[in-house]
Amino acid sequence: RDVALDGRREVNDAFRKTVAGTGSYDTIVPKFKALVDERDPNLDYYARGTFTSHNLDFAEDVLSIADAGFDRLSVEPVTADPGCGYDLTEDDLPKIEAEYDRLTDIMLERKKEGKPFTFFHFMVDLDQGPCVVKRLRGCGAGYEYVAVTPDGDIYPCHQFVGKEEYRMGNVFDGSFDMGISGQFAKQNIYTRPACRECWARFYCSGGCSASNLLVNGDISLSNEVACKMERKRLECAIALKAIAAGMGETENTSRNNTECNQCGFCQ
């Protein structure tokens, strides 16, 4: 459902290159646009990008994607090894938070101009939302789904691939470590110390285990930089909902949770 596009040509081509080593923007954008134009209009899609410390003005990349003809967008913070040169740090947060505020203003202005677009991280359901189980533990890595490599090795999700201590088994020999699965199944907003007192816990549902491991070496210890970005996005999302309500608007700016059937608890 997603097509990968990081925004402006120079931003995209810095990381997304062809096999020949050249930038991919001019090749992929016309193809992505044709794909989106021909899709079933009842099916969601997202033009999904990533921002790094090299493009903290990422609202410009959101606008670039929108101006390229896409109206369902997601530009997300990079997950990268600390110190790699493009990872996001605490020092970047003031610029990132200001950019989310700027993006909020841009979206309001675009709406007035009759050129609205959807930004995934600014979607929040204040009326219903997901079931209580999903509010307590949003990520199903390791127990609701797994990642399987071409060699058949099983990991909790794609971000754990190569981390031998989290290899759960192999599809070819039939092995599967239920102990690792149970370790992930026990994760929730009350087992993670930083989540317990966080006002955003029932919207965030505990964050990403892989991100926690990458930054803190423990899937239970929250990545505080990621947490601060999530809280800022939620502030912007709630502000947009409040402004829309004040204008008497009723259009949907919520993620669709009506078809959630992943965990089976509500069946």
PLM region descriptions:
Residues 1-9:
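Conserved SAM/AdoMet-binding glycine-rich loop
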Residues 4, 76, 201:
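Conserved residues at the C-terminal ends of beta-strands
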Residues 10-29, 33, 37-141, 145:
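Radical SAM enzyme [4Fe-4S]-AdoMet core and its adjacent flexible, acidic
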Residues 95-128, 158-205:
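C-terminal accessory region of radical SAM enzymes
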Residues 151, 190-267:
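Radical SAM enzyme core and accessory elements
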